[in-house]
Regions:
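Primarily a LysM-type cell-wall glycan-binding module
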Residues: 456-494, 499-511
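Membrane-lipid interaction segments
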Residues: 2-464
């Protein structure tokens, strides 16, 4: 700790709340007559697309749509895809009243279900899991007051000794943006699109004055029927670059971004198949800093009562992004049958756990992979879960910590599949995938700093003396000795050639 003569102050940046909520989104699809009738549903996928929030007092209203894609075999024997986007809306009571702009919401769709109600009618449902959080910013200052409640006069305040320390903290802000782009995709000249989807994969995120620049690719996934009657899948990278308004951002801020493909449409042009993509991007920027907190105080001439406050301060652990490769196999597969082949593959990654130890943050999860296999006029879906880990270096003092309790950490992570491959090898299917992961974590630490020193009556006069000696307890700090004796810390340090943080071994100290 450091002894600082000036008055400590600053903003105590903490976490106001970090909570979860869940609900369901459901809807029905009634397909037009030009769609083939449903003979067999092959798979259903869902993606949550948040688009609104409103905060009034402690009430939060948020909503959006869920984009469903249902792949099925029609009565014509071919694969078809139908989409729907039912809306969802929820109301949540917040633990505290905060400005609406400071509330962050992340929603994801899980466990999509599909039920056939009629040859051209489907019932859809997905579970929605939402994270709602907000940071707090509370002014902190140290003040001196008299016993009567007035501000202490300058002469009395000058007798105060303050023991302060610098505590790391971080300011976190988030912004959102909706953009669009287009580009050609890899497909045969006569290919007929069956299903398309996409994901956002930023590779460069930089902060500058009041803006965040995000560069990356939209990975377009296309399932198509070729002229020879076989199905092929392809992935194409469509580049994008966006400058997102970010009020308060500065050069050098640590930044990250992730996003969702809201819609992907395929059209045929003279250059081939072209993808038109709309996407949402969330960007976060962090600015590490410090706040000076007063741990203890006393007056060398007056009796002093201390007032303390509860404070929770967050500091940055990590903010990182990168790629991860995963692989696995399906041991017993329909792909082992004669003339069977892999039609398509898809994966939904999820990150379930984070651990912080040895100077590293380890985010663990799994990619739930679906492999579509054509055989004997049918298409079946086979599942495999591929575990993965993403590691990032911790910053600041956490770099040297052996471990950090999970209760002190808050984190978020997002993952997207940028490429996935499946290969038939005998009677099994080997699957590999590339993921893009964006993760950030912060540590919350509880303090009870001194916010007020109330100066009361003058200490009893110890009488005239040339030298005053104090016998400290072994292990007692020089600061504690000076406080107990009502001595000037600077004099104790100067006379004994020690520092306030030094621990005593029981030898006497001259305090005057």
């Amino acid at each position: 700790m450091e002894k600082i003569k000036g008055a400590p102050d600053g903003l105590l940046r903490g976490i106001e709340f970090d909570m979860g909520a869940s609900g369901d989104c459901s809807g029905e699809i009634v397909m037009p007559d030009y769609y083939p009738e449903i003979r067999k549903v092959v798979s259903v996928s869902a993606r949550a697309l948040p688009d609104s929030k409103f905060v009034s007092d402690k009430n939060l209203e948020y909503g959006g749509t869920v984009s469903f894609n249902v792949l099925y075999i029609g009565d014509d024997g071919a694969l078809s895809c139908v989409s729907a986007s039912p809306e969802y809306s929820f109301t949540q009571t917040l633990p505290a009243e905060v400005p609406g702009a400071s509330v962050w919401i992340d929603t994801c769709a899980e466990a999509p279900q599909c039920r056939v109600l009629a040859p051209r009618k489907l019932s859809l449902r997905a579970r929605l899991r939402t994270r709602i959080c907000a940071d707090s910013s509370t002014p902190y200052a140290f003040s001196a007051a008299s016993a009567a409640g007035d501000a202490a006069d300058g002469e009395c305040a000058a007798t105060l000794e303050k023991h302060c320390r610098s505590v790391p903290t971080v300011m976190r802000c988030r912004t959102s943006f909706t953009g669009s782009t287009s580009g050609t995709v890899n497909a045969g000249a006569g290919a007929k699109p069956v299903m398309c989807d996409g994901c956002v994969a930023p590779h460069t995120v930089t902060a500058s004055a009041d803006r965040i620049t995000v560069k990356g690719n939209i990975i377009v996934h296309l399932l198509a029927l070729e002229e020879d009657g076989t199905y092929t899948c392809s992935r194409s990278a469509v580049p994008f670059e966006e400058e997102i308004p970010a009020d308060g951002a500065r050069d050098g801020d640590i930044s990250s971004a992730w996003g969702r493909a809201a819609s992907v449409g395929i059209s045929r042009t003279d250059a081939g198949l072209c993808a038109d993509i709309e996407y949402d991007i969330d960007a976060e920027w962090c600015r590490p800093g410090e706040v000076i907190l007063c741990d203890d105080a006393y007056s060398t001439e007056y009796k002093t009562e201390l007032g303390r406050t509860d404070a929770e301060v967050i500091s940055m652990l990590c903010c990182a992004a990168g790629s991860v490769g995963v692989s696995g196999e399906i041991a017993k597969s329909k792909a082992g049958e004669p003339q069977a082949y892999v039609v398509d593959t898809a994966a939904v990654p999820r990150i379930e756990k984070a651990e912080f130890s040895g100077g590293r943050a380890v985010f663990s999860g799994a990619a739930d992979v679906k492999v579509y296999i054509a055989h004997s006029g049918e298409v079946d879906c086979e599942d495999v879960s591929l575990p993965f880990k993403f590691e990032a270096a911790l910053s600041g003092d956490a770099e040297h910590a052996d471990s950090i309790p999970s209760g002190e950490c808050v984190w978020s992570a997002h993952a997207e599949v940028t490429d996935i491959r499946a290969r038939v090898d005998g009677g099994k299917v080997t699957v590999s995938a590339d993921l893009f992961v964006s993760a950030e974590a912060a540590r919350k630490t509880h303090f009870e700093p001194v916010c007020e020193a109330v100066i009361e009556d003058r200490r009893p006069d110890g009488g005239e003396c040339c030298i005053r000696v104090c016998y400290p307890r072994s292990g007692e700090s020089v600061w504690e000795v000076a406080k107990r004796c009502g001595a000037s810390l600077s004099e104790v340090e100067r006379i004994n050639k020690v520092t306030g943080d030094s621990l005593c071994d029981g030898s006497p100290l001259i305090v005057k």
